[in-house]
């Protein structure tokens, strides 16, 4: 069991991570801005990832993601990336950093709810198909058709025949996607028992995060070992050349984000596409233009 000092340190890092999440949107992508915030650059201690280095690497990788986006649009490439892992493993965090500076018309997130009564009667993969990309699009699945191999298996939401049929079907389904020109990447975010315990406690005691905890999440915690067995079976039976699994060590949230983004960029045959210069046109002005005052009753009160 972790000592009080270890737990206290982890809680502190979790708080700092939430603070840095706000900074990510506010900081400019330049070294001067980082100098003002963190002071002159110093060498990281062995095994440590400084906040300054994290921001620098995140911004660098996000610049590459913009290049990837431009290349996808230019070439009509189609990309699907699946993010799987236990509850609180950090899937949403890396998805947020990937999409943070991208065009939502090009890169979108698919996070499907539990199937409704009608969807439960469909071909299992049917409800996912409508979310697949057209040319020039990237789709990030925050959980995916692998729910059947994980939560549905562990919680008893599918029977043995449905479970086995999934394993018979999913390799062919993913090979079909590959033949259609879709590049498919599959990531499993791996966290330890102790780390999930800490992250759940953080959510329980943070009013801004309690919404992230569902009764299903709490039950999944109790069934940790069953999830381990389900995960191992899934990776073994669905790791195929056309769509291999990649495991992200995710106990350290920031390292996991950087490692995952760096890896997915390496899997893409993208290049920088020259962009035409953008010129701001002069505003047209007409002699008879009048801007009428806005009625006071529809103006939002300036409380702040």
From Swiss-Prot:
Any one biological process term the GO annotation gives: ATP biosynthetic process
The UniProt record lists the keyword Iron-sulfur: no
Sorted UniProt keywords: ATP synthesis, Kinase, Transferase
A matching Pfam family: PPK2
Catalytic activity field: [phosphate](n) + ATP = [phosphate](n+1) + ADP
MF terms (GO), sorted A to Z: polyphosphate kinase activity
InterPro entries: P-loop_NTPase, Polyphosphate_phosphotransfera, PPK2-related, PPK2_PA0141
The enzyme's E.C. designation: 2.7.4.-
Record-linked NCBIfam families: PPK2_P_aer
Stated role: Uses inorganic polyphosphate (polyP) as a donor to convert ADP to ATP.
Sequence similarity: Belongs to the polyphosphate kinase 2 (PPK2) family. Class I subfamily.
Protein name: ADP-polyphosphate phosphotransferase
């Amino acid at each position: 069991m972790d000592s009080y000092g270890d737990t206290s340190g982890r809680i502190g890092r979790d708080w700092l991570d939430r603070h840095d999440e706000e900074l990510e949107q506010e900081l400019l992508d330049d070294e001067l801005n980082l100098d003002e915030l963190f002071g002159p650059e110093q060498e990281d201690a062995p095994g440590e990832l400084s906040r300054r280095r994290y921001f620098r690497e995140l911004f660098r990788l996000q610049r590459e993601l913009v290049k990837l986006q431009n290349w996808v649009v230019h070439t009509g490439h189609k990309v699907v990336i699946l993010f799987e892992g236990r509850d609180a493993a950090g899937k949403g965090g890396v998805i947020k950093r990937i999409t943070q500076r991208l065009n939502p018309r090009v890169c979108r997130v698919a996070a499907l709810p539990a199937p409704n009564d009608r969807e439960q009667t469909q071909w299992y993969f049917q409800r996912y198909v409508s979310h697949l990309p057209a040319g020039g699009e990237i789709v990030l699945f925050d959980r995916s058709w692998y729910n059947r191999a994980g939560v549905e298996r562990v919680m008893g939401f599918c029977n043995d025949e449905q479970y086995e049929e999934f394993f018979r079907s999913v390799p062919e389904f993913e090979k079909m996607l590959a033949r259609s020109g879709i590049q498919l990447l599959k990531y499993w975010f791996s966290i330890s028992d102790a780390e999930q315990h800490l992250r759940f406690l953080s959510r329980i005691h943070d009013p801004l995060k309690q919404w992230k905890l569902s009764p299903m999440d709490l039950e999944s915690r109790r069934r940790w070992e069953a999830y381990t067995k389900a995960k191992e079976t899934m990776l073994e039976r669905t790791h195929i050349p056309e769509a291999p699994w990649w495991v992200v060590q995710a106990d350290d949230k920031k390292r996991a984000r950087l490692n995952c983004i760096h890896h997915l960029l390496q899997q893409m045959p993208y290049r920088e596409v020259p962009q035409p210069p953008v010129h701001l046109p002069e505003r047209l002005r007409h002699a008879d233009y009048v801007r009428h005052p806005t009625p006071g009753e529809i103006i939002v009160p300036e409380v702040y």
